Amino acid sequence: MSAISWLEQHAPGFSGLSATERGLLTDFALLWSLFEGEVLKAAASVNTIEQTVQRWNQAGLLLPQTFAAAADYFKGRYFAEGVFTYRFDHLHLDRSGNPQVVRNVLSGQDAAPESIASALLIIVYRYRCNLFHGEKWEYQLQEQEQNFSHANEVLMRAVEFNRRVQQNVQGLSE
């Protein structure tokens, strides 16, 4: 029996997910693994994310529009009408040191490209924690399509940025 067939029979809500939703979840698992291994050197944390973003910023890669679509989506999901939404608490930022940068970016208090990149990657990191530690199963993976679509875009861009920085470093040492 394939894992998908087994999940359809045994995982609450899995059989109700569309092929697109299932694909996005699979893509996320693979992209996160690549990102954490290649970019964060198998040491994912808020600190390593922020250090990585600083390298990108120093290399001149971060512009205001770099992560604009994802930033707009996450702002709309987690901050509306001047307050953080009920979904914001489900990120469980307290489990990752409660980084203020996420609040500042989502509320519009900080629009610096490096802050936006850090905040988005921290949100994606929390998606990883919530998915792989089981919290997302509490609500049967419902309403996750856009979350993982944007998270995947952020991860792909992050891997590309990291490779550019690595190429620049290699070019300087030759």
Regions found by a protein language model. Give the residues of each.
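Amphipathic alpha-helical interface elements
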Residues: M1-G108, S115-I116, W137, E174
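A generic "alpha-helical surface" signal
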Residues: T26, S115, A119-I122, Q146-S149, ...
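Charged/polar positions within long, soluble alpha-helices
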Residues: L40, A44, C129-K136, V159-Q167
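Repeat-unit-sized solenoid/scaffold elements
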Residues: S107-Q109, P113-A119, N162-Q170
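Histidine-centered, metal-coordinating catalytic motifs and their short helical/loop contexts
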Residues: A117-E138
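Short conserved catalytic/interaction loops centered on acidic-Pro-aromatic/His motifs
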Residues: E138-E145
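Amphipathic, Lys/Arg-enriched alpha-helical patches that create a basic surface
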Residues: Q146-E174
